[in-house]
Amino acid sequence: MNRANLLKLSARLGAALAFAANMTLGCHAQDLPTLPDYVPHEHVSGTIRSSGNDQMAGLMKRWERAFMKYQPDVRFVDTLKGTASGIYGLEMRTADIALMGRAMNPFERYGTYERSWTYPVEIEVATGSAYMPRKSPAFAIFVHRDNPLSKLTLKQLDGIFGAERGGGWKALSWDEDAARPSGQNIRTWGALGLKGDWIDKPINVYGPPSQGAGAVPFFRARVLNGGAMWNEDLREYADRGRMMADLARDPYGIAYAALSYGNEQVKPLALAETDAGPMVSVDKANVANRSYPLARPVYVVYTIDDDRSEIADPRVDPKVREFLRFILSRQGQEAVAQEGSYLPLPLKVVQEQIRKLDSKETPPEKLLLGE
């Protein structure tokens, strides 16, 4: 690489790092003062063993140090080798909690029950980053910068990226109400209201491998209503950088990727949940308050024993419950803000997670398995 190109690359890298720093400085803290303070319900002791997402290691350490100020007799052992390893730790009973950068899929939920006779419970503990890669970032929908389109609804995205389907997965259930006909496919820019030369131009669809793990199931759940039928002409890329470079040369292309993969030749679109709106741009504030439709949560998962297990304890482990109460408190979410990679939860989401933690409802796996 000659000196001129090296200088250009250095300048681009510097600009990208500055943008990333700006996106991660501070926190969207308007809800933090209204979150409940952590007040211990009981004194607990013992060791909490965690497995799972290594990207959450720094955040976990902050939670641990802060929690032990309130519960000094609790210790932690962390084995964080990746999200998939978190499920294995729960199944083998070598972990009490799993840190997850994504939601569990139906096969993991069934598998956990079949292997360990336990029911997994997901608790949202933070929102993924608005920008930072590998930190469960929100998805942006990109088009070429010369494309006059500025916004889409999730239904339109389904029409673009999806295809005819007989239903979709909703947690553990196959939902036939998620079915849609091929007549709802959107394959030209004119079908989205563009005029002139755009009317009959095809929509060239770019994305990660359609059967990929991690982030792809989130897109299927949110955009394809849990279905797995993709646009028949989907161009699949394992390398996101290459995908975005190709999109930059294609005026008729559209792609989904983390915001950090953007470049000067593409632009992100505003999105709306429904036709009624509102249209919401992808930025840090809108990801943090969850108004942007493709913001992604991160989770802590624990398990409850089936009451027929020989080592059954159908209650939530008290030390795990106290730790999760701390994470969902003002102090726990302040730790999220201070860590800087992830975003604190809005008050409404915190309240929903506390209700789930306190719930006495029968686990859905038990209902579906007819136990």
Language-model segments: which ranges?
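Intrinsically disordered/low-complexity terminal segments and short unstructured peptides
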Residues: 4, 21-23, 50
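N-terminal secretory signal peptides that target proteins for export/translocation
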Residues: 1-8
